[in-house]
A protein has these predicted regions:
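Receiver (REC) domain switch/active-site residues of two-component response regulators
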Residues: 106, 181, 243
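Primary recognition of N-terminal secretory signal peptides and signal-anchoring hydrophobic helices
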Residues: 1-104, 178
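Conserved, mostly hydrophobic/aromatic
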Residues: 108, 185, 245
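Substrate-binding surface in catalytic domains of secreted glycosidases
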Residues: 118-121, 125, 195-280
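A cross-domain feature marking catalytic cores of carbohydrate-active enzymes
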Residues: 87, 112, 143-147, 187-189, ...
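Active-site-adjacent "subsite" loops/lids of carbohydrate-active enzymes
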Residues: 147-178, 228, 246-257
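Glycan-recognition patch characteristic of GH18 chitinases/ENGases
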Residues: 68-170
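Mature extracellular/periplasmic domains of secretome proteins
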Residues: 97-102, 172, 232-241
Length: 280
């Protein structure tokens, strides 16, 4: 079941966040948790953005109207070396119980968001229990956001800077309500003529998220002569905006290739990684 509310627009003054009830916010799915077959709203992270706060007294919980201000979260930045897992089919019932990396931090990126012409579209599978399970296992949770890999759609939203603010507000609200530490931008197949707009869009989102102590990353392909799939990325500028630039070290040989070959051979991955390190 999906329950959606409209969170007031967030405004920042120093380290204090003010909820402006006069400014209509963006729709946000409430964090639902299941216990013994029943559904409940998980308010642990959601307050005061959903309008309530709570106090515990033994076995009793008291709900009260939430204050209209709160402090910026103090999320800890990730520490390298990083191990990063991408989860295209997030399953709340079977989170990976082990750490991928014991000498640095671990990030999990569930595929939960898509850009929509009117704002952010969340997956019906978004789940607060998934977030809590991974965070309990020492992971940072950075959901993945796609542009649908549609160049025409992407051109439209890149030309409409008014919708950028909606995306930023929604991402911040979701991060505070669900407990996300950051986000991963997976914007692919973008028309080369929109290269500068894409660069500004990523920089805008990263800057707005940073104000609320939320980290960000952007995925880029390896190097090729493809305008929409490789040349469109201004990797150096991305590195000045986001916290991490993620190299998608594939496909050396595409699925539709007329000749057989490896997907990601070691020399190919090494060459692309070394070239990108010279830029970022």
């Amino acid at each position: 079941t999906s329950y959606t509310i409209y969170v007031p627009q967030l405004e920042l003054n120093g380290t204090t966040i003010t909820m402006n009830p006069k400014a209509v916010g963006e729709p946000v799915k409430l964090p639902i948790t299941k216990r013994d077959g029943a559904e409940y709203v998980d308010v642990e992270n959601a307050t005061p953005l959903i309008g309530v706060t709570y106090t515990k007294d033994g076995d009793h919980v008291q709900l009260t109207a939430a204050p209209e201000t709160m402090q910026v979260l103090q999320n800890k930045p990730v520490q390298g070396p990083l191990s990063w897992a991408f989860d295209p089919w997030p399953n709340q019932d079977a989170p990976y119980a082990k750490k991928l990396n014991v000498s640095g931090d671990n990030i999990i990126s569930p595929s939960w968001f898509k850009l929509h012409s009117l704002g952010l579209e969340s997956s019906p599978n978004i789940n607060v229990d998934y977030v809590k399970a991974y965070k309990a296992n020492g992971y940072h949770v950075w959901p993945l956001i796609t542009n649908r890999f549609d160049p025409d759609f992407t051109s439209g939203i890149l030309a409409d800077e008014a919708v950028w603010k909606k995306y930023a507000q929604n991402l911040i609200q979701y991060a505070y309500i669900y407990g996300f530490d950051g986000y991963n931008f997976d914007f692919e197949n973008v028309d080369y003529s929109d290269r500068d707009k894409l660069t500004r869009f990523v920089a805008y989102l990263a800057d707005e998220l940073h104000k609320y102590n939320i980290q960000s990353s952007v995925d880029v392909t390896g190097y090729s002569n493809s305008p929409n799939w490789s040349l469109v990325y201004d990797r150096k500028s991305f590195a000045n905006s986001v916290d991490y630039v993620v190299l998608m070290a594939y496909d050396e040989t595409w699925a539709k290739s007329t000749t057989a070959g490896p997907v990601a051979s070691y020399p190919w991955v090494r060459d692309h990684a070394e070239k990108m390190l010279q830029e970022v």
